[in-house]
Each structure stands twice: as C-alpha cells, then as structure tokens.
Design a protein with these regions (language model features):
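Acidic, polar-rich low-complexity tracts and alpha-helical solenoid repeat scaffolds
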Residues: 1-168
Length: 168
C-alpha cells in the first residue's frame, strides 16, 4: 500500500535523523503499529535491528505482534492471507505463546474451505492439549470428519471425550 510506504519512509527519516530523541522513540512506536496493521512484522524486526539508538524488539514481542497481525487479517474476513500468516507464525514460533490460537484459526479456516486434512491436522494439534479453550470445538470438528469418513470407532472416541467435557 502506497500510504503505508510513504508513512514508513517519513518515520524512518525521523528515526535516522534524530536517534535517541523522543521523536525517534515515538516514530518507532508508530512504525511498529503501521507494520502490524500491514501484517509485515518481520520487516519491522529487521528495521528495528538496523536502526541507530537504543531500539530493542524482543523476540516475545515479535511473537505476539506476528500473531496479532495474522489475527487482524482473519478478523477482516481475508481467509487466504490469514491462513498464510498463521502458518508462517507457526513456522516461526512452533511453541509460541499463541500457537494454540493459530492452530484453532487454521482449523476453522480449514473447515470453511472444506479442507478436511487441515482440520484434522490442526484439531489434532489442539487435542494434544486436552484442557485448552478450543478442545470441545476441536473434538467436534475432528469427530465430524472421522464420522463422514466412516471411521466410526475413532469418531465415537472423540464424541465420548466431548460428552465427558460437556458434562463437567
């Protein structure tokens, strides 16, 4: 987007011309927001690493912002880029703070796109942690696909786990 790129260049100019100043600090804060909104957190990390002054971009913050950027794309209803962003998040942060959330969204996107393999993969990842907030929904989606594939014993096992969760 042209507007983003122009704003980025203007803020970069402030940071490089006035390193260490309050203006540079505010410019970096605004740059971070722009890059998150544009789903380009990796570019911000690279930029922060090369900028002069006391600029730090911690890995935990990069983890969080990468996830937040992907979630924003999903919330806009853009399933394909969201799928790509969540997949990239999981590749970069396989045990990241938001990995369960990312697997959940990929599971939902898979269901929306009728991609049974994606649903099974990501629901399976969610079910590795049976007490997570998404486990009931994951059991339901997982069991439904197994049932439709006539894998009744496996589907029944999922439904029994779901029943046990729903009654507790």
């Amino acid at each position: 987007n042209d507007d983003y790129d122009r704003a980025i260049e203007a803020y970069k100019h402030v940071v490089t011309q006035y390193p260490g100043s309050e203006e540079a600090r505010l410019a970096m804060r605004d740059l971070k927001s722009i890059y998150v909104d544009a789903n380009r957190v990796d570019e911000f990390a690279a930029l922060a690493a090369q900028m002069p002054g006391e600029i730090r971009f911690e890995p935990s913050e990069q983890d969080s912002l990468t996830y937040i950027a992907a979630e924003k794309v999903y919330m806009k209803g853009e399933a394909a880029p969201a799928k790509e962003s969540f997949t990239r998040y999981l590749q970069s942060y396989p045990g990241g703070a938001f990995s369960l959330n990312a697997h959940y969204y990929l599971c939902v996107i898979g269901k929306e796109q009728k991609d049974d393999e994606a649903v099974l993969e990501h629901a399976g990842k969610l079910l590795e942690y049976p007490d997570n907030p998404y486990s009931e929904e994951a059991l339901l989606m997982h069991g439904e696909i197994l049932f439709n594939r006539q894998q009744y014993d496996l589907a029944l096992a999922d439904y029994k786990k779901l029943q046990a969760k729903a009654t507790t």
